Amino acid sequence: NNAEVVWSNQVAVNVAGAGYDRSQRGFDLSYPNAPDQPNLSGAGFQQPTFDLVNAYQVDENGLPMIDTYADHEFKNDQDIESSEAWEPDMETPVDPRLDWVVGRRGVPYHDWGLHPGKAWIRDQVSAGPYNQKKWIILENQLATYAYDNTAKFNAMNFNIIRYAQVLLWAAECEVEVGNPEKAKEYVNMIRQRAKDGSYVRLGDEAPFGNGPAAANYKVDIYKDSWAGLSKDVLRKRVRFEERLELALEGHFFFDLVRWDIAEDFLNKYVEREKRHIQYLNGAVFDKNHRYYAIPLTEIDRSY
């Protein structure tokens, strides 16, 4: 835990003879399918989408391209074997949070080494070329925070609510009650931290140290006045920040539902993503998909 945690699921390893029974099991299937790294390897699920990665591209001012990010696809190694020569994009400016969230070829996968690309991907055809990175412990933490040196059985608590999320909720509220500058203040607190925080580095001490940046990182706060902007524009700015900051933390789908934009957003997403992910052809999201089915066991108990 740290000062940002508001509510988290507490886990542990190697306590009271429990082994990994109390460990963080929720993400054991989402560790990379990495046969050359048996201490790291998992099933390779929870892959970030092309659309999410594209969303981290920024303009010349380091601001998100909310309405146009999908017009330019960030360079990726889809359909390229790890044995084939390939270099990551070092020119397109991206928000530095990208490489703390997404594992991609040519960028340090925390301290596990450079991500090799397709060799660590379960099936690029089904889900693309990326691995999740947000819920991966460091290799140098294995002895302390993992069971039997197995990274996926670890003592990393799962944050259900953290302070950044509270700030962004507050920004949403300020937009709705007509205080746009206060909303900007809250959003800029998040963006300033991203600007002042550490960037993923190359070199012997990767991803930390003083080596060269692993990409052309650029991020800045909003400096224009939010007063006078329409609520539609303000909502887009706050919501986009929530997507970037809270990516892969399990909130975005439910945010889309509560904002009442799930059908519009997800159907546009399908149109973009199916260029690479063929099983999405013909997929349609409608209002009946917004809510989970009630389990039969719960229905039976309600009589």
Identify the role of each PLM range:
Residues 1-25, 61-303:
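Acidic/polar-rich alpha-helix caps and helix-coil junctions
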Residues 25-59, 121-129:
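Short, cationic low-complexity segments
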